[in-house]
Amino acid sequence: MASGQARPPFEEESPQPSTTVRSPEVVVDDEVPGPSAPWIDPSPQPQSLGLKRKSEWSDESEEELEEELELERAPEPEDTWVVETLCGLKMKLKRKRASSVLPEHHEAFNRLLGDPVVQKFLAWDKDLRVSDKYLLAMVIAYFSRAGLFSWQYQRIHFFLALYLASDMEEDNQAPKQDIFSFLYGKNYSQRPLFHKLRYQLLCSMRWRTWVSPEEMEEIQAYDPEHWVWARDRTLIS
């Protein structure tokens, strides 16, 4: 950066999104049948993942990117201690985890559920191999950790987060390949760009891909009647 001073990677100076790195647009070609119909148009430049970086960003090594992101990250919310029981002069404290998941992250998730390509993907994944309720809850958790404004999350972020969740939770590599099969079919040319954007998202999350069972429950408890929580893989015979 020209000034030599590190800035938080997701702090925007204006309501306009950054145009440094634009995520590819996923569109549906209705004339092509089968699950490979959606594809990512290679012509437009990918939209920003929220990283305000110089134009030479893509030429930096992964180590340099990690070091710069480490300097630019905003402080994480700190855990607090609350009184659990009080008996006479004795007091028992319980550590309360500071959750980074906000209502706006649920709103961004719900907005993307209305996207026609996302809806088609969820309907296509009949066996819930890559979109059961736990993996979808992890998408919300990842949205909270990436640090973007809710309006910045686009269709590609949903698939990037779902890929990371599957990579974290599934031993089988096949479910992740299902995402590629749906988005690109047999076209392999777009996969390197997908992995580049995946790496950017992973860095913005500080590599925190594990989501605790408590956080899973908290995310689902925000709207327990939401239809996505009925996507339970264990109930499929």
From Swiss-Prot:
Expression by tissue: Predominantly expressed in testis.
Gene (name only): SPDYE4
PANTHER family, per database record: WBSCR19-LIKE PROTEIN
InterPro entries with a match to the protein in the record: Speedy
MF annotations from Gene Ontology: protein kinase binding
Stretch list, region Disordered: 1-61
Lineage, top ranks: Eukaryota, Metazoa, Chordata, Craniata, Vertebrata
Name of the protein in question: Speedy protein E4
Coiled coil start-end: none
UniProt source species: Homo sapiens (Human)
Family (UniProt): Belongs to the Speedy/Ringo family.
